[in-house]
Amino acid sequence: MSKTIKVTFVINNGEEKIIEAPLGLSILEVAHSNSIDLEGACEGSLACATCHVILEEEFYNKLEKPKEEEEDMLDLAFGLTDTSRLGCQIILTEKLDGIKVRLPSATRNIK
């Protein structure tokens, strides 16, 4: 059995969904495989910002800095914050155990 970590998705209405997610998947993949409404229109190819999520600063700081392509797409995201990332670019590792991922109230798909 592959190792899992705890991921909490905070949905727009404040509801929290706690999921045991396998290491190596992206936040976008975990959302899709657990019926969480995180769009991902470009399927993780860094061509949109519909998988925009907001992280707690503690976990944001555990990630590598976003690449320029991700930053360019984040500039298009609705409700951008200092701890915004694209869900397709966050790959689960052990150091992210307990991560809380907040979904923004809306998305903007500019392709």
UniProtKB/Swiss-Prot annotation:
The keyword Metal-binding applies. Residues 5-107 form the 2Fe-2S ferredoxin-type domain. InterPro entries: 2Fe-2S_ferredoxin-like_sf, 2Fe-2S_ferredoxin-type, Adrenodoxin-like, Adrenodoxin_Fe-S_BS, Beta-grasp_dom_sf. GO terms for biological process: P450-containing electron transport chain. The keyword Electron transport applies. It comes from the Bacteria. [2Fe-2S] cluster binds at C42, C48, C51, C88. Keywords: 2Fe-2S, Electron transport, Iron, Iron-sulfur, Metal-binding, Transport. One of its GO terms (molecular function) is metal ion binding. Binds 1 [2Fe-2S] cluster. Its cofactor is [2Fe-2S] cluster. Ferredoxin are iron-sulfur proteins that transfer electrons in a wide variety of metabolic reactions. PANTHER family: 2FE-2S FERREDOXIN-TYPE DOMAIN-CONTAINING PROTEIN, FERREDOXIN/ADRENODOXIN. Belongs to the adrenodoxin/putidaredoxin family. This is 2Fe-2S ferredoxin. It comes from Rickettsia bellii (strain RML369-C). The gene is fdxB.
